[in-house]
């Protein structure tokens, strides 16, 4: 009997633009303070593209992809499919997956864009696992890339959101391996609840109104992201423990089997509350939000790469990837590193 196909992480990479914006820097543009931001979010700094712009999500994604490909030992031509997650595409269309494909020097490799915002890696990893186990593709490159800084309201009016976000990209090379060992993607659980779409959204530009962007929209700030922070917090502390238990059940594991939790890096208080609800020690929570802020689709793959680099996880580690974001969407993936 042939061995089952598993999806393993072959290589990871992350990239941030060189420009660092500290909490103190933000006080030049808005009424805030380093202490206020740290206490509410855990963020100390974030990376933004140059003030003059000219850098897109696919550009950041290219740099992260190069690192991941190198660590995987792949050439770009080894990629069977590109999955690109973002809420901040370079242009309205086509999506950054196709732009990245061209920048990698590829000609006809399929490219798929997903718009799951903060849960893009979870949805992308579950999709890639299904593709790989079906035999359709053997090697898949997932990239999450974001340029938030160009569309933030960097003023006192927008401070509740503007202080949160950073520009970045994370990449993961996923490969099919035939093995009886309980490794790779062990289980996934995905959910959405569209009735809460309006608590975390960016309304304009839009195709449902004419014109798609107007002076009135700009005056009202509808071209900036908006968030009902308390509502997002409430949903997160409820849904994250639920989906964690669901994916553990699917994988026939218990909370005690988790070596490390790598969550979406949205807010330190959310993640600490989630760990407490599961009865997990904070030492099993990986966090780098203090250095990068919320990087949305890049967040979890960046944190995975960072955790591997710091040797917080490695061969044999059982990891819970988990997050909640706009949509609302939320999900979790149980993963065990080979070895």
Describe the residue ranges of each PLM region.
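Flexible, glycine-rich active-site loops centered on histidine and acidic residues
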Residues: 133-168
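Condensing-enzyme catalytic core mediating Claisen C-C bond formation in acyl metabolism
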Residues: 1-53, 156-234, 238, 242, ...
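Claisen-condensing/thiolase-fold acyl-transfer catalytic domains that form or cleave C-C bonds
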Residues: 58, 62-65, 69, 88-89, ...
């Amino acid at each position: 009997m042939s061995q089952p196909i598993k999806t393993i992480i072959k290589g990871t990479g992350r990239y941030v633009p060189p420009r660092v914006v500290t909490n103190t820097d933000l006080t030049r543009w808005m009424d805030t303070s380093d202490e206020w931001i740290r206490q509410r979010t855990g963020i100390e700094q974030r990376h933004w593209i140059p003030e003059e712009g000219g850098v897109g999500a696919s550009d950041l994604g290219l740099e992260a992809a190069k690192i991941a490909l190198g660590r995987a030992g792949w050439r770009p031509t080894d990629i069977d499919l590109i999955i690109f997650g973002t809420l901040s595409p370079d242009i309205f269309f086509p999506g950054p997956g196709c732009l990245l494909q061209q920048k990698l020097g590829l000609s006809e490799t399929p490219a798929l864009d997903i718009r799951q915002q903060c849960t893009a890696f979870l949805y992308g990893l579950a999709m890639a696992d299904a593709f790989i186990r079906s035999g359709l593709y053997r090697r898949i490159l997932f990239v999450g890339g974001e340029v938030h800084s160009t569309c933030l309201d960097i003023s006192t009016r927008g401070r509740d959101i503007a202080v949160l976000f950073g520009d970045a990209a994370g990449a993961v090379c996923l490969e099919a391996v035939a093995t009886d060992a309980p490794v790779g993607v062990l289980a996934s659980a995905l959910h959405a609840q569209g009735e809460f779409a309006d608590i975390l959204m960016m309304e304009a530009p839009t195709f449902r109104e004419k014109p798609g962007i107007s002076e009135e929209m700009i005056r009202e700030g509808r071209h900036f992201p908006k968030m009902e922070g308390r509502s997002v917090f409430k949903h997160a502390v409820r849904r994250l423990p639920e989906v964690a238990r669901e994916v553990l059940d699917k994988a026939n594991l218990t909370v005690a089997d988790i070596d490390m939790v790598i969550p979406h890096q949205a807010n330190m208080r959310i993640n600490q509350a989630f760990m407490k609800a599961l009865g997990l020690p904070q030492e099993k929570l990986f966090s780098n939000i203090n250095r990068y802020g919320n990087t949305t689709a890049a967040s979890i793959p960046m944190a995975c790469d960072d955790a591997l680099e710091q040797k917080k996880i490695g061969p044999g580690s059982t990891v819970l990837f988990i997050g909640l974001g706009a949509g609302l969407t939320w999900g979790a993936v149980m993963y065990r590193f080979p070895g």
